[in-house]
């Protein structure tokens, strides 16, 4: 067997034998990969669970992302959802469907990205199981579990009039990176791997904000302990996600344009930062900064004026069907 063997040539068993050693173990794991199901400790008696899917085309382009990027982003996006509930990420289950002619090294790279993201963003979280299948389109689906450690979950429905609106993490950087890729890493309208590599060298911070984001995972627990009244992961853009929080809480969010910054910060997606509201007299945990206030009404305001831009990312309206 050579390092360039395809999945079709080696089969599932041999592919898994090469992937398993690369995956991180979970601290809460009582029984990991190899049986029909994993067994995970739940000291709190409850667990938080979320799932997210990445599909080649609408969610990523192989010409732009390395396999390591894909594994990292698949982990990071799910870890951020767990953090947004005020929980500690404990375990991931990963399902991958890939074309038959995909090299096994593709899956090894994805596994390495999953491992490195867990170790960097949520130490102690690991991959406890999953599935491999064949498909004409590369698809990565991750289910994440989290431990509330005895606390109540922080919902998106608890914001109160008078609260401050805060964010931990970046705003607009992932959108800026994506804009650069579309503007400068395509040839005849198709993603270009060589140009993307050059961009990665020139604008590394912004490109990685899009392809391999670093959400502030540990800040979710800090926010919960500090008394956050509502919280949510900014996966689809500040304006769109803030509107969701406002609707769930029955309030309006008035955002400060100076604190928010660029239009990309409002309308761009995939930063995976944490949007949280706190009582006005709360001591904000390190890493959170005020970007607005909770007021009566509904929807989103910017400097007191309604902000009606659709903005954000909706996979059913935002994808143009491009390949690459």
At which residue positions do the language-model features occur?
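Acidic, Ser/Thr/Pro-rich beta/coil linker or hinge segments at domain junctions
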Residues: 2-3, 7, 11, 46, ...
